[in-house]
Regions:
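An N-terminal, globular interaction/scaffold subdomain
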Residues: 2-21
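Long, charge-dense
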Residues: 20-41
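C-terminal structured domains
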Residues: 23-28, 157-310
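Extracellular/secretory-pathway and virion-surface proteins
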Residues: 32, 52-54, 111, 116-152, ...
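Short, low-order "capping/linker" segments at domain edges
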Residues: 37-58, 292-310
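Extended, charge-rich low-complexity interaction segments
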Residues: 52-79, 273-283, 310
Length: 310
């Protein structure tokens, strides 16, 4: 099962893998992500044939555990000029199979195909795994280990309390950057793909003012931990997968992909009703969508932007 480099799709494939029936597993060994194969080559029906020894690679470090690849393959130059997309597919797929798709997704953040070689020294694609190991990287093909790697981020918060949800965020962490970026850019492609498969990505949102009444921020983090604990139980992890959280000027956020959204909302509703938090909502990562109230103000009023629809 290949996510084709799509991290959101990878969450779905891992969930599918873990829930495959015994009957299926008797006949199939389900692996997620293209597996590394030494001396692998790609051959097409119309005569194209390349291996890791046919591709020159230039590796550039972009940040911690983040690299850019530039690839040059003389054998594919005619294809690159006439069918550029196909040439890219062959080279990225070959890289998946030389390196392993999970390490490729984890460490290679930029991939460029060159029409002529660079002047700087290069190495062969077949040597890429060893070159990355020399950088101290672990080339694990375990998709769950990759999905559990979190990235911290900071934002310039909007002071307007009536701005869209999450625009007040100062800092957060996520193991699924595409969902955060998609929401902020009002890009619904990932949401559409999840929706087509019966899954929903979104976040719980609740006010922080009552938690801030005591000095320090520890109470804020303790509350988020308690909410997340509801969904790290066996029952909770069946209905959703946590993907991060954030702290804003006004609200706290807990992010997730839900496999059973109705049960996830029921569990969250029960949690919030047992707390002193005055209100809480669920909102999808579809920015223009309405919100679902999980707990309402004592006077029955709803918070800004709320409605009763998913």
């Amino acid at each position: 099962l290949t996510p084709e480099g799509d991290k959101v799709k990878l969450f779905e494939l891992v969930y599918f893998q873990k829930h495959a029936s015994k009957e299926v597993l008797e006949h199939w060994n389900i692996l997620v992500g293209r597996q590394p194969l030494p001396n692998i080559g790609l051959r097409t029906e119309d005569g194209w044939n390349i291996s890791g020894d046919d591709v020159q690679i230039w590796l550039e470090e972009q940040g911690e555990n983040s690299f850019a690849i530039s690839a040059y393959c003389e054998k594919l130059l005619p294809m690159l000029r006439e069918e550029e997309g196909r040439a890219w597919w062959m080279l990225t797929t070959l890289t998946d199979q030389v390196l392993g798709e999970i390490p490729h997704m984890r460490y290679i953040d930029s991939f460029d195909v060159l029409e002529e070689p660079k002047a700087e020294p290069s190495f062969l694609l077949s040597q890429l795994p060893d070159k990355l190991r020399e950088q101290g990287l672990e080339l694990s093909t375990d998709p769950e280990a990759y999905l559990e790697s979190y990235l911290g981020y900071k934002m310039e918060p909007k002071q307007d309390p009536d701005a869209d949800w999450r625009l007040d965020v100062m800092a957060g962490s996520t193991c699924c950057v595409p969902l955060i970026n998609g929401y902020l850019n009002a890009d619904n492609d990932f949401m559409d793909d999840l929706h087509a498969d019966g899954a929903v990505a979104g976040f719980f949102c609740y006010p922080l003012d009552t938690l801030r009444e005591e000095e320090g921020s520890q109470k804020i983090f303790d509350f988020r931990d308690k909410l997340e604990e509801v969904f790290t139980t066996d029952e909770g992890s069946e209905v959703l997968t946590l993907t991060g959280g954030a702290t804003g000027l006004y609200c706290g956020y807990v992010d997730f992909i839900a496999w059973d959204i109705q049960e996830a909302l029921n569990m969250a509703k029960e949690f919030f009703e047992g707390t002193d938090i005055p209100w809480a909502i669920f909102h999808t990562f579809r920015r223009e969508a309405g919100s679902v109230p999980l707990k309402q103000q004592d006077d029955g009023t709803e918070t800004e932007n709320q409605d009763d629809e998913l």
